[in-house]
Amino acid sequence: MNLNINSDISKAETLPSSFYKDLESFKIIKNKIFLRAWHWVGDENLIAEKNSLYPFTLLEGFLDEPLLLSRSTDNNIKCLSNVCTHRGNLLLLKPCKSAKIRCMYHGRRFKSDGKFEFMPDFEKTKNFPRNCDNLNSFLVKSWNKLLFTAFNPIVDIEKVLDIMDKRIGFLPLNKAIFDSSLSQNFKIDAHWALYCDNYLEGFHVPFVHKDLSEVLDYNSYETEIYDHCNLQIGYSNKKEDCFIFPKNHIDYGKNIAAYYFWIFPNIMFNFYPWGISINVVKPINLKFTEVKFRSYVFDKTKLNKGASSDLNKVEKEDEFVVQNVQKGINSAFYKSGRYSATKEKGVHHFHYLLSKFLNS
């Protein structure tokens, strides 16, 4: 499917309804976008000690890529393929501590950095070992103890994190602790991009989120667009339950209750005075999506206040409208719409990037 989203939002039309129903586009997105995206995979506590090994599946049910986080004796963190280079067996099935990675199938052994080390009964095998006998090693970025990985990224993660740091660098994120009580997975009967569409605009807040709209100043709501990320700034009607900025901060003197950062294509970082809620949107099929919420808290006294007073309620309200849109786009009479040039900058940005990389 060839998509053409005009770069001028005042002239552009939204993604056609056919995009959300096209299986071929869904498959192409996997290879052209998700396999080339940066992915948030957790935090350093997954491999807190030296010689820690942590196997996981990246975007299970969609990418289904077996990976392995490794922390060596010199505290070097790696993200490796969890697939043995001999016959394709999964190397590890559960977290463990070991200075070596050993395949349980035929005994092939690797160092913690993924380099091939030993294979029994291969003395007569010619031209062995080769570079391809090492485990594939992927890019890793640690930011405030949060871990990201990528294979062949189209996004410059350093630029994105620098943009985020300019706004939230003053927060003690390195002291934030994972809170399982505020973390869960949501299953939504809708296309993954519809969920992102909804997240990327505050236009719907007065109509869908009555309680949240009493906290946020709708008329002051802002969206800032960058290359591969964007930021929505949630201003408050009052000073209570807002960030306390240092004097040299770009937003010093403003009543800001939340920063909502989105990284193309599917990661949301929601910053509040108490900490951060990270949302990862995982496509499953054309009509089903899973969204992972993970929260890290550095100030419990500020929980359940302001713009984050009831995140679960807001999520359910969002799911309700997104699932209604999923039903609506199946209409034979809806093709596409237009953007509000002032209120839907984030949605347009998302659609433009999708079209850019799908057409590349």
Regions found by a protein language model. Name each.
Residues 76, 82, 141, 146-360:
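C-terminal catalytic domain of Rieske-type non-heme iron oxygenases
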Residues 47-153, 158, 165:
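Rieske [2Fe-2S] iron-sulfur-binding domain
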Residues 1-19, 176-178:
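Short, contiguous pre-domain boundary segments
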Residues 17-62, 68:
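Non-catalytic accessory segments flanking enzyme active sites
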Residues 41, 91, 116, 212, ...:
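Short clusters of hydrophobic/aromatic residues that line enzyme substrate/ligand-binding pockets
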Residues 36-41, 48-50, 119-124, 261-265:
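Short Pro/Gly-enriched beta-strand edge/turn motifs at strand-loop
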Residues 34-38, 89, 204:
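Generic structural signal for secondary-structure transition and capping sites
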